[in-house]
Design a protein with these regions (language model features):
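Extracellular/periplasmic carbohydrate-active domains that bind, remodel
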Residues: 1-180
Length: 180
């Protein structure tokens, strides 16, 4: 296990992902006062496949931003005119190429977060949504709930989000979200 105090993130993968990241296991950590808890990040043009990531038994306290974030628009660097946050959904979505980042097969369990700005933020790409993410047996106490964009095959199994502001869960272009 590990203890992370007052850093940018407790556990971070990215943003330069051209070689990808595979088969990573993180267990038994404490993140106290970090900017984010778990963060995986990339953007168009960096490519790479991030897959088979296992994270379990994580305690977070006083996270300044998101407890758990996957962001494929990292650093607000979307490609203009590609149906991203700065354009219309009617604009053409770019084709998938070797420069398109891909995040899939992520297995997260036994997360406890006592205090964060937002519990969960998933922000995939229209042309490459986040795919096959399982979050199990977790509790998030935060100001804001969860926001999911461009994601598919998501399982929240025994996930409790206790937020003091806004909706518990906001979805935009999410396919096959199961809550048990």
């Amino acid at each position: 296990g590990c203890t992370v105090l007052h850093g940018h993130g407790g556990f971070v993968i990215g943003s330069e992902m051209s070689s990808g990241a595979r088969n990573i296991y993180v267990n038994n950590c404490l993140f106290n006062g970090t900017d984010t808890g778990l963060r995986l990040k990339s953007t168009r043009g960096r490519g790479g496949i991030v897959e088979n990531i296992y994270v379990e038994n994580i305690n977070m306290v006083d996270i300044k931003g998101d407890a758990f974030t996957f962001d494929l628009y990292y650093a607000n660097k979307p490609v203009a005119g590609k149906a991203d946050s700065t354009t219309s959904e009617a604009d053409a979505v770019p084709p998938v190429t070797e420069e398109t980042p891909c995040f899939r097969n992520l297995f997260i369990s036994n997360i406890t977060c006592q205090g964060a700005k937002r519990a969960i933020y998933f922000n995939g790409l229209p042309e490459m949504p986040l795919d096959n993410l399982q979050l199990k047996n977790s509790l998030f106490v935060s100001e804001k709930g969860a926001e999911l964009k461009y994601a598919k095959n998501i399982l929240f199994d025994n996930v409790k989000i206790v937020n003091s502001q806004g909706n518990r869960l906001v979805k935009n272009n999410v396919e096959n979200l199961t809550e048990e």
